[in-house]
């Protein structure tokens, strides 16, 4: 499991807040933004629409801690909200949240299902019934993994992988469902996938 690559987004301080000025800013190819957080004052920013949209489409901004370069001053931040134009499908505004380097944060991490070729159940024609595609974890910004692996080795038809079976990277722990050993995925028979998943999710 590799840690996330740190993406840098360039931003400039913004002193305009009125609607007309914001509209003019967008026409020039920019996006208004704000960054906020506990212990910090709100800071109004301007982003390059081309640069930010490119990173968004590459999938580098969702559930990632990024480096905000604010007129030469670098800060850690999370993208918390993106507002879209209802007709043009262009980004209208971005909210960031400051992240302190030494703090522990909550973040959703995607699950990656590995070793399907080592699952006898899948070799026999079983299908994956994925019940959970991401989990919320706690970790410091420098420990955020790109994904968390779910090992399917040895799994037969009718068997499940529960959250207790998933090995978390060092420095990463569950943020939610800490007392609930919920089902992540089952190997279901191709002709009875629904029935198999219902049985497995009720098992303790």
Swiss-Prot record:
GO biological-process terms attached to the record: translation
GO CC annotation terms, alphabetical: cytosolic large ribosomal subunit
InterPro entries for this protein: Rbsml_bL25/Gln-tRNA_synth_N, Ribosomal_bL25/Gln-tRNA_synth, Ribosomal_bL25_b-dom, Ribosomal_bL25_C, Ribosomal_bL25_long, Ribosomal_L25_dom, Ribosomal_uL5_bac-type
Keywords: Ribonucleoprotein, Ribosomal protein, RNA-binding, rRNA-binding
Gene Ontology MF terms: 5S rRNA binding; structural constituent of ribosome
Keyword Ribonucleoprotein among UniProt keywords: yes
Short name of one Pfam family: Ribosomal_TL5_C
Function recorded in the entry: This is one of the proteins that binds to the 5S RNA in the ribosome where it forms part of the central protuberance.
HAMAP family on file: Ribosomal_bL25_CTC
Assembly: Part of the 50S ribosomal subunit; part of the 5S rRNA/L5/L18/L25 subcomplex. Contacts the 5S rRNA. Binds to the 5S rRNA independently of L5 and L18.
Name used for this protein in its record: Large ribosomal subunit protein bL25
């Amino acid at each position: 499991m590799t840690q996330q690559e740190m993406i840098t987004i360039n931003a400039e301080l913004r002193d305009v807040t009125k609607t007309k000025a914001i509209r003019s800013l967008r026409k020039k190819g920019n996006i208004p933004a704000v960054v906020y957080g506990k212990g910090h004052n709100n800071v109004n920013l301007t982003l390059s629409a081309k640069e930010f949209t490119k990173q968004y489409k590459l999938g580098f901004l969702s559930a990632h801690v990024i480096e905000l370069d604010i007129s030469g001053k670098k800060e850690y931040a999370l993208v918390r909200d993106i507002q879209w134009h209802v007709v043009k499908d262009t980004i209208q505004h971005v909210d960031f949240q400051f992240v302190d380097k030494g703090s522990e944060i909550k973040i959703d991490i995607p699950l990656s299902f590995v070793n399907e070729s080592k699952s006898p159940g899948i070799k026999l024609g079983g299908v994956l019934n994925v019940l959970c595609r991401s989990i919320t974890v706690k970790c410091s910004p420098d420990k955020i993994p790109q994904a968390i692996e779910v090992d399917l080795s040895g799994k037969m038809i009718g068997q499940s992988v529960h959250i207790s079976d998933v090995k978390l990277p060092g420095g990463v722990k569950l943020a939610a469902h800490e007392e609930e050993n919920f089902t992540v995925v089952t190997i279901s028979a191709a002709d009875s996938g629904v029935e198999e998943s219902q049985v497995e999710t009720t098992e303790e």
